Regions:
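ABC ATPase NBD coupling module
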Residues: 16, 70-86, 100, 104, ...
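The feature captures the beta-strand-to-loop junction immediately N-terminal to the Walker
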Residues: 39-41
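Helix-to-loop junction immediately C-terminal to a conserved catalytic motif
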Residues: 54
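Conserved ABC ATPase "signature" region
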Residues: 117-134
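Conserved ABC ATPase signature
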Residues: 139-143, 147
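A short, proline-enriched helix->beta-strand linker immediately N-terminal to the Walker B motif
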Residues: 158-162
Length: 240
């Protein structure tokens, strides 16, 4: 059953000299438990689609359905969707408040949603992403890039989402740390039964993570790939 449905999605922005079309008529669907990826060069519209699905980009046209709920352009997410759809951003440092301890960063979403047993939930989240309990006392600048991205993933997992949106989650990390984070994401997906929508320009990341993928250029989805095509590296030729 498709838990994400996107039909004829278009997004435009005001730009110098006129209107820029960031996404033009994109259509795709995600099945429960799979990883579907969008690949393409920077500026092709991948991250804009993620922002629409996260409720961050509210000016768009088309039909979007998340977990059986039809999304209305211009409106904030309501109810369970605010918990069930979470996003991990490209730059972990920029997405973490520099003056908040890791404990505060992780505890605040739980408090906002009226959760109980906050101490235990924060400790559990850190353990799930392989961080020691004492990391909760630190500030973002006291952590490595890989550790900060683990915190960002832990924060997204705290509300036990069904859909995780991943915007270039390893592009700011060293190669050795990239593999650790990708393997962590795969393990967590299996443990929690989540569905991933991954954005990347890295053909190796797409092949490692994805069940299916689509190649974008100039706001348009030009080609789709199943798992066999990804294993054969067909997406590399499209991206070349």
């Amino acid at each position: 059953m498709a838990i994400v449905k996107v039909d004829n999605l278009s997004v435009q922005f005001a730009a110098k000299g006129g209107i820029k079309t960031a996404v033009a008529g994109a259509s795709f669907a995600l099945e429960q438990g799979e990883t579907f990826s969008l690949i393409g060069a920077s500026g092709c519209g991948k991250s804009t689609i993620l922002r629409v699905l996260a409720g961050l980009q509210r000016d768009w046209k088309g039909d979007v359905e998340l977990l059986g709920n039809r999304i209305t352009a211009g409106k904030r997410f309501q109810g369970a969707l605010r918990r069930e759809v979470q996003m991990v951003f490209q730059d972990p440092y920029a997405s973490l408040h520099p003056n908040h301890t890791i404990w505060r960063t992780l505890a605040e979403p739980l408090k906002i949603h009226g959760e109980s047993k906050i101490e235990a939930r924060v400790a559990e989240a850190l353990e799930q992403v392989g961080l020691p309990a004492e990391a909760a006392k630190r500030y973002p600048h006291q952590l490595s890039g890989g550790q900060r991205q683990r915190v960002a993933i832990a924060r997204a997992l705290l509300l036990r989402p069904k859909i995780l949106l991943l915007d270039e989650p390893t592009s700011a990390l060293d190669m050795s740390v990239q593999a650790e984070i990708l393997n962590l994401l795969n393990r967590l997906k299996q443990q929690h039964g989540m569905t991933y929508l991954l954005v990347s320009h890295d053909a190796d990341v797409i092949a490692h993570m994805s069940d299916r993928a689509a190649f974008m250029a100039n706001g348009v989805i030009e080609r789709s790939f199943d798992r066999a095509a990804l294993v054969n590296g067909e997406h590399r030729m499209a991206h070349a």
